[in-house]
Amino acid sequence: MALSSNWQALLASESNPTSNGKNKQSNRKIRNVKKVSKTVNVSSTTQYAPRKRKNGSKIMDMVYNMNKEISKHEKDKLEGKVFEFNPNKANTSTTIKEPVKVGISEDTRINSNKSKEIGKYIAMDCEFVGVGPEGKESALARISIVNYFGHVVLDEFVKPREKVVEWRTWVSGIKPEHMKNAITFKEAQKKTADILEGRILVGHALKHDLEALMLSHPKSLLRDTSRHLPFRKLYAKGKTPSLKKLTREVLKISIQEGEHSSVEDARATMLLYKKEKTEFEKIHRNTFN
């Protein structure tokens, strides 16, 4: 009986066990090599993988960073790069020196290094107290004049000729103690007249201040911010704008937040004039030429 080819091959393999064993061993080696290489690859990958942080290490990092920032802050403080408020050195006094200045002060005015000469342009402002029945009438109590650059030319408290009924301190800033070194009305009038002579006078509602001083000044030499038409149209619907409103709207500066200062108000009017000087002079030429 003839054997099939498959059967013959099976017999041949059984008759040669050595060869078959070698093949099996060889196959095992190949499989082992594959396993080893796989293991090596896995180990090489896990060797560089980041380890999980423990909670303790996060806290230590935070402590380290905090200490680092503290050290940097101390170093900057020693080098003067850091401002530190020291309550022991701070001036916490509630006493306010007179006169109260808000907004435009000696230190904040523009052109503070310019000439202190009187010059061609001056700005004037006055403060008043109440006299007469119920203190409803006004009497001159302070006169202040500054030059074009804001330097004080004249600043004097003035003794009213009438008995003061209402000091109006809340708005005027004038107090009874200011009268100790005050000059007389006649002295104030004379000093002011000498300064005004031949100069361009800037102010707000100048008619009122000049009448209080019993002085006159040529209209061609007046620059009144309360009567400047562009200001009236833009900020008061054609009426007379307050100095406080003009200063806030035009200069972006707040004044008269408490007791008034005639020095501050005079500086404010000069700044307003300088801001719109071209328009002021254009209207002036059209009016007087």
Curated annotation (Swiss-Prot):
InterPro entries: Exonuclease_RNaseT/DNA_pol3, REX4_DEDDh_dom, REXO1/3/4-like, RNaseH-like_sf, RNaseH_sf
Polar residues bias (residue ranges): 1-24
Cellular localization per UniProt: Nucleus
A GO MF label: 3'-5' exonuclease activity
Compositional bias annotation for Basic residues: 25-34
All residue ranges annotated as the Exonuclease domain in the record: 121-273
Biological process terms in GO annotation: ribosomal large subunit assembly; RNA processing; rRNA processing
Keyword annotations: Exonuclease, Hydrolase, Nuclease, Nucleus, rRNA processing
Superkingdom classification of source: Eukaryota
GO cellular component terms attached to this protein's record: nucleolus; nucleus
CDD domains noted in UniProt: REX4_like
Cross-referenced Gene3D superfamilies: Ribonuclease H-like superfamily/Ribonuclease H
Enzyme class: hydrolase
Keyword Nuclease listed: yes
Sequence segments annotated as region (Disordered): 1-34
SUPFAM superfamilies: Ribonuclease H-like
Entry similarity comment: Belongs to the REXO4 family.
Function: Exoribonuclease involved in ribosome biosynthesis. Involved in the processing of ITS1, the internal transcribed spacer localized between the 18S and 5.8S rRNAs.
Miscellaneous note of the record: Present with 4280 molecules/cell in log phase SD medium.
Name the record gives this protein: RNA exonuclease 4
UniProt lineage: Eukaryota, Fungi, Dikarya, Ascomycota, Saccharomycotina
